[in-house]
UniProtKB/Swiss-Prot annotation:
Gene designation: MATALPHA1
Species of origin: Saccharomyces cerevisiae (strain ATCC 204508 / S288c)
Protein name as catalogued: Mating-type protein ALPHA1
GO biological process assignments: positive regulation of mating-type specific transcription, DNA-templated; regulation of mating-type specific transcription, DNA-templated; regulation of transcription by RNA polymerase II
Induction summary: Repressed in a/alpha diploid cells by A1/ALPHA2.
Family: Belongs to the MATALPHA1 family.
Amino acid sequence: MFTSKPAFKIKNKASKSYRNTAVSKKLKEKRLAEHVRPSCFNIIRPLKKDIQIPVPSSRFLNKIQIHRIASGSQNTQFRQFNKTSIKSSKKYLNSFMAFRAYYSQFGSGVKQNVLSSLLAEEWHADKMQHGIWDYFAQQYNFINPGFGFVEWLTNNYAEVRGDGYWEDVFVHLAL
């Protein structure tokens, strides 16, 4: 039953640390700029002079009002968030998350599953707004103010502001 031979054989492989890590000849011959794709960089766009928070469409607001009436809730006020309960998220905000965070305040009194479908429908209805919300999300992620997106957005973009110059990052960090 017992044998002196092993039941299996281990095959020795070359360690990854011994692999050739030198730069290939092709890369040495060409400039580095030719190998770098522009999509690798996160470019923060300058503040735009004329950018404003998009107003929700009347169709969207009418649908929300219909669902409020159907559910028996006539609460038309925006949700008030408790500032102590908002925690700064480590996750990066994308354009749809920014859109959803801002527009969901118009749907207070509507069930969450209904509101989610209305927001998704509104998002797909107007593709021109995607760039604006992407801009807001990039700015928020870059600045990382330490408080909620909706509060940051209303503080910074409720009115047209700025002269279109590049943002001074240190000013935002000091705030």
